[in-house]
Amino acid sequence: MGAIHEETANRSPIPDGHQGAGDRAADHRHSARRAGRWPAPGGVCHFAGADQGGGVAGGQSRMGSSRGTAPRGLRASDGGTAGASSVHRQEVGSRRQEETGTQVMKTLVTAIQKGGQGKTFATCHLAFDFLERGLRVAVIDLDTQGNASFTLSAYQSGYLASQLFTGDTDDLRYWFGKREGESLALIAADANLANLDKMELSQAAAALRASVAALGEFFDVCLIDTAPSLGVAMTAAVLTADYMLSPIEMEAYSLQGMKKMVAVISNLRKQNPKLRFLGMVPNKVDARKPRHVNNLATLQQAYPQLILPFSIGARDSIAEALGEQMPVWKIKKTAARKATQEVRALADYVFTKMEIAQ
């Protein structure tokens, strides 16, 4: 079977050689194929420093951005991360683009070995936000629960996730070549994903890499949502991705899941050296609960270089938005405003770290 042996993964140390977050500017070159398709952003503005102690990033959110148009600018974080210990140093999302003269599609996977952490929330909201920036976005749902497929059902491409592992890349190119005008395309989860654990990991990873490479001819960004188990699908996705993001709740079981995931990342980066871990996103944080505050402090102490400099609060408006198949900034309630600021801050952070050209 293709899954990584958990005991072996957990013995792997985190690699040294941290590169400071945000120390490289994005490369805003266009390829000839993509030039002129979308308007470039009008400028760059900054959002205020974030509260590392479980609070919310400050600054104004982009309320009212219209779908399908690039906003006037994007906000780049002015905050750094705390110094990393020698044990837990990890390069955090600071990757120089290849000097090829073209802008290649960037691929991000959301993954953690624990369910209910917010992977689907992050995937869907990044997709909605990137769409508003004028990017062409492909979303791959590799979780048989299909929650991302539900929220993004209005953007069905008709191509199924299992076909990325079993189909022909020429067929994939033909399929999306006919639908090239679509700016957001969902590659939905299907029942056949359950059969992937019967595949050899090397075969599954090679097939997914080839399919994602073919998707790169039609999209600027590919976002992959994964199941919480370290099976063939998640492992193949991590071996394919350029970047990885791990939402995490502030509960004891979640912290255990993150410890496993950090070890797995170290192991898989040996096979996928281009992978950059953007960090852990503290999610569903309730500052009124002492255990959440204490667990966040524990995470920050254990992995100071890997915790994002802001958190997402425990807000019902986010769950409501996912159920209503829309981003939280479309929820017309006062309670959704704070959630909007937090989610926009996350999207800005990820966008900047992925060095996506517009």
From Swiss-Prot:
Disulfide cross-links: none
Transmembrane parts of this sequence: none
InterPro entries: AAA_dom (IPR025669), DNA_Partitioning_ATPase (IPR050678), P-loop_NTPase (IPR027417)
Ranges in a coiled coil: none
Location of the region described as Disordered in the Swiss-Prot/TrEMBL record: 1-101
GO biological process, one term: DNA replication
Pfam families per the UniProt record, alphabetical: AAA_31 (PF13614)
Domain of life: Bacteria
Keywords from the UniProt entry: DNA replication, Plasmid
Composition bias, Basic and acidic residues: 88-99
Family membership: Belongs to the ParA family.
Role played: This is one of the proteins encoded by the trfB operon; it is involved in plasmid maintenance and replication.
UniProt-recorded name of the protein: Protein IncC
Taxon lineage: Bacteria, Pseudomonadati, Pseudomonadota, Gammaproteobacteria, Enterobacterales
Gene behind the chain: incC
